[in-house]
């Protein structure tokens, strides 16, 4: 049974009697050719020949003239190929048409899906991250496999033999190994990248730079090239005499070498990395939810963190406020939690990709070295064909996993299908990453709790910007001129960092994070305290993930905000 038989339509057309072909096959060999069995045995994947002077294959029976390796035998001058046409004819049976239609749809789906992944990252700046560069490399390898290898493999399945010559067969087999190895190594690289992203979420941009990513990808393709050139340099089985036979080499040494380098070592790294990702994700999630996460050592990054402290306020002479006994509510909202949740979600998405990869490729890389070392354990031809194409199926299914698991890729795919390459630019300036408008809610407050004249008026925007402060504090407000650490903070004060230097145009990711935080703050500030000024929340500090030398040059200013006392650590 062949792969074509598994996918063929139920059709049996009349076959021409080819006994004449057997009788004309070389001097004195007609009777032997006509009496030969329908399928000669194959030794080492090379089609066997029937006995007789000129009857290389028995075409007289009218059956398919194929070896156990799925390749046609060498017919005589008047013999038939696959029992449908004379030598040189490419007439395909109905079952071949069915297989061809299925494989053509398969190849087109693989090409289109991987093109969508590449164009999605190319046309959307917010997807142009180091992790997605590795995903693009995976899509490039799968695209090369789908466009340069699979069409010839499908043609060989439909025709039943290799029709492109011996030299091109060697090149085709090498490119096949190259693309498959590059695809598998890309998944290995992605798993390491995800571990670094989850384990060191804030340090990740400094650890995994674009230059390092480019070096890793270059090394990846070099390793894939080294694995694939072995057969071209002679590390393969003896060349079969029939040029219409073409397949991957099953030489025992090379089969073991390629299986270890292309699959087993990368799979071991992938499994270890994702086990570590799971352990780190579980421990970090618990510590963040419990509010006990502490920075170890001297941090080189800043954490976007808001501390909300409940305080009872009232008339207090010159300062107009005083502290009182009561419950102190303190919550820490950190971008680390938000970024970590994004990294964990990305790790889940890529874990699905890796799981599908193992299911697709493990059967092939288990059967290949096993059959090379122990020929008696080789599976049947039909089973091997299914296993062989199951590995190719991985290149088709990878692009289907992204839109199902990643909302960003799903939106990018939809925009591409609607011929919208880029998002429309927002009208507001690109440097404005956080906006929160004052609530006109001071009418019900006592005068001693209302914002002072030195604070920003209602309706004034609160924006985290990358530009210097356009409105310097008036000289008559010594509290605003005092250092941040020494002056008393007004109730419900929000300190705004204004970044300088290289952060003049913050990234889209930072805008998205702070925008999400804005929604949480607005939701938390919707509920007012029952007694006016009885319980106020103070947004004590805001800091961002930037190096210390950049943060030292940032300016700070205080504003009155609404009550945010019901914010929790897990809100973001």
Curated annotation (Swiss-Prot):
GO biological process terms on file: adenylate cyclase-activating adrenergic receptor signaling pathway; adenylate cyclase-modulating G protein-coupled receptor signaling pathway; cell-cell signaling; G protein-coupled receptor signaling pathway; neuron-glial cell signaling; phospholipase C-activating G protein-coupled receptor signaling pathway; positive regulation of cell population proliferation; positive regulation of cytosolic calcium ion concentration
Record: glycosylation sites: 65, 82
Record protein name field: Alpha-1D adrenergic receptor
Subunit structure: Interacts with FLNA (via filamin repeat 21); increases PKA-mediated phosphorylation of FLNA.
Record InterPro entries: ADR_fam, ADRA1D_rcpt, GPCR_Rhodpsn, GPCR_Rhodpsn_7TM
Keywords noted in UniProt: Cell membrane, G-protein coupled receptor, Glycoprotein, Lipoprotein, Membrane, Palmitate, Receptor, Transducer, Transmembrane, Transmembrane helix
Lipid-linked residues (S-palmitoyl cysteine): 419
UniProt cross-references to Pfam families, sorted A to Z: 7tm_1
Region (Disordered), start-end ranges: 1-77, 444-488
Family: Belongs to the G-protein coupled receptor 1 family. Adrenergic receptor subfamily. ADRA1D sub-subfamily.
Ranges of the Cytoplasmic topological domain: 122-133, 193-213, 276-348, 406-572
Record's function text: This alpha-adrenergic receptor mediates its effect through the influx of extracellular calcium.
Gly residues composition bias: residue spans: 23-33, 42-61
